[in-house]
From Swiss-Prot:
Pfam families for this protein: Ldh_1_C, Ldh_1_N
Protein name: Malate dehydrogenase
Function: Catalyzes the reversible oxidation of malate to oxaloacetate.
Protein family per UniProt: Belongs to the LDH/MDH superfamily. MDH type 3 family.
Positions that bind substrate: 82, 88, 120, 151
Residues forming the catalytic site: 175 (proton acceptor)
Protein's organism: Cytophaga hutchinsonii (strain ATCC 33406 / DSM 1761 / CIP 103989 / NBRC 15051 / NCIMB 9469 / D465)
Gene behind the chain: mdh
Amino acid sequence: MKVTVVGAGNVGATCADVLAYREIVNEVILLDIKEGVAEGKALDIWQKAPITQYDTKTTGVTNDYSKTANSDVVVITSGLPRKPGMTRDDLISTNAGIVRAVTESVVKYSPNAIIIVVSNPLDVMTYCAHITSKLPRNKVIGMAGVLDTARYRAFLADEIGCSPKEIQGMLLGGHGDTMVPLPRYTTVGGIPVTELVEADKLNAIIERTKNGGGELVKLMGTSAWYAPGAAAAQMVEAIVKDQKKIIPVCIKLEGEYGIDDCYLGVPAVIGKNGIEKVIELKLNAEEKALMETSRKHVKEVMNVLDGLPQQA
């Protein structure tokens, strides 16, 4: 299996490293527009192989998409990261142009690839890649829910004092302030989280999760990369190993949850065909209202993208 990671910044390089270290695929191509960056990071990852014992070959290239030909999966991480004071939506104009150009090059050389979008604003960049690629919706997937849910689980693990592996949870909706928490679907070792965490503390964790990316931007001066890179690699693994794993991903909704033509995070079965099935959870009135708020926000930003010049 061959996977291409476009963008050799922090997130892209981390994704490539995880794919190699865990031997998820046979070959990783790391591509970047900046001369030498992808080559250097890929070489560094490959030189780690004798130490940490893996065989996945990593190769870096500078803006030569012919070297990515016949990739099974392509992860798009290209774009500007957030700076303190910025929202994800502030990145739309610049990153839309980048994602559009990258997607066109990707499908030219790997027309059958499944595309995973990591660039922000995530939901709208998934829309951008989807309409540019003209691929079926099951083959263009946004990485958001995996990361948001991981942050939620990590915060809960700290509060409860348990392993994060014991926590199962799900977050829906947009990637950002309008994400939809589902505490009643959250369990800790099979125990409902509401039995272990008081309501006010649980609400505080939910709010912290919503601002999880912003918290890291304030601390580091730029966007996170370890968890996002690992989250993208987990999605790649589910696809190339045909795991039929149920994880929250951003996808174009076509009637699910009563929503049409909008890109939102929902749980789905992920396998060799990308999105194999969308899981529709039964939402209560409050959750439906939050989902509608999320839909409205994402749709507004989609409309902004529609109004941008195509060469933006």
